[in-house]
Amino acid sequence: MTDNQQQRYRFSEAPIWNLNRSYYEEEGLKAWNNDQVPQYITSNPMIATAYAEMIFGLLQDQANKGNNTEPVVIVELGAGAGRLAYHVLVELCKLRDFASITLPPFRYVMTDLAMNNVIAWKEHPALQDFIAEGIVDFAKFDAVNDTELNLVASNITIGAGELQQPLIIVANYFFDGIPQELLYVGDGHIYEADVFVDYPEQADSLKPSEVLDQLSLRYEYRLAPEYEQEDFAYRNVIATYQEQLEDSHILWPSSGLKCLERLNQLTQSGFVLITADKGDNLLDSFKFAEPPELVLHGAFSFTANYHAFVQAYEESGAMVLFPPHHYKNLNVGCFLNVDMPKSYTNTRLAYHRFVERFGPEEFFSLKEWVDRRIDTMGIQQILSFWRLGGYDAEFFIQSARQISSLLPDANDEELADLASGIQIMWSSYYVMEQKYDLALDAGLILFEMDMYEQSKYFLEISINSDEDEIVSTVYYGLAVCCFEMELAEEGLEYTKKLLELEPDNEDAMAIIHSFE
């Protein structure tokens, strides 16, 4: 097809956005299985603790203002697999219960474009206690169009002006993947970069992820004087780009800005936005910027333009917090778009302590370094980093082999701390379809520690969750656990199952003969 036969699109209306939507709608929660779409960096216990601390800070601030009766609503945009929401709720409830002070009630609303995800969250075993307590709810929410929240658990609709408390908005890996415009600054003028899409052959027969992986984009530029009009809503931001940038491409977050405007209409008291993304809040990052490239991960995303949000909201009176240093993997910001933002002292202090000083970005960078050196770490180093990460399941899985090798030389205190850590980890584990079996690794480690009752508990969880892929080692371990616990009949049953997998296993045959 020649250029003049191809359709030309505004960047925000290009077919790539529909492909992105289709990917998430078709894949549902499977999109986050085994990190097809990255989720660990924005949903681990460490970042959840930081968010819970900021939310708890806002609850304290509202209590100090005497606003204790109306609930504070927390809306997570694009809640993905649900892991972040779960960890935030776990930590937030711990803080609430530990503090034992008067606070306003709260409700965490998980939202997504795909209704299948909403249904899956509502049915997830880990969230049932929170549902019963009334502190979590769910809504299908289209960030590009919707103006209200229809909560499916409580059957409540939140419409314009109905919230009296500030709305807390959580947006991780969100602004980088919703429709936006591509602008170009040249000779002091603003251009829109329209796009032509070159599709792979037989695109209609390919999955959205396959089409995205194989298509290519080409751009043509046209003057866009509407951005230079005095009545353009974000005229000052555009003027900054005209004055300080040249030969630069800018992703203009049109949908993101409008989404925040619509969410702001739900409340009488403004909002606090907590957001993390690969996103630039410094203007220097855009100087002489080339056209953006699709970052592919099943779906696609771009580097978010946080700068536009920062300037727009600071000029309207908000306080915006970003770390003073540069980021590599994840930029975490907090927007206090409320009256007298400096009066939100506890919220700001929480950001300082849990993001700015040492936060999710620093933890992830450190974890990448640790991951490459686990086989050199001692038990104390492993325990220390595990605690730092909030007894993270992924780190335990990665370090299980090294832990096993260190057990013979571990002292009683270290073994006790390890066993305690496993229990803490499991108590806040959010089950997802993953390539690893956490219960199996926990059970085998405890077996090596001669903690047979605890080992049996986890090994039985493992075999009950995946009966098609049971290895003989598990039945052997369960049999030994039962015999050590004087559960002879149960131990015999596991021994028989071991023989079904390994008919020539001499130890198992000897046990069977001893019962005859």
Outline where the language-model segments fall.
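N-terminal charged/capping segments associated with class I S-adenosyl-L-methionine
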Residues: 1-71, 76, 83-86, 90, ...
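Conserved SAM-binding loop of SAM-dependent methyltransferases across substrates and taxa
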Residues: 81-101
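Conserved SAM-binding motif I beta-strand of class I
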Residues: 99-100, 105-112
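S-adenosyl-L-methionine
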Residues: 118-161, 227, 234
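A short SAM/SAH-binding and catalytic strip from SAM-dependent methyltransferases
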Residues: 153-187, 245-258, 266, 273
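A mobile, often basic/glycine-rich helix-loop segment
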Residues: 171-224, 294-298
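Rossmann-like AdoMet/SAM-dependent catalytic core
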Residues: 243-473, 480
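"A position-specific structural signal for the A-helix of alpha-solenoid helical repeats
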Residues: 441, 477, 484, 510-514
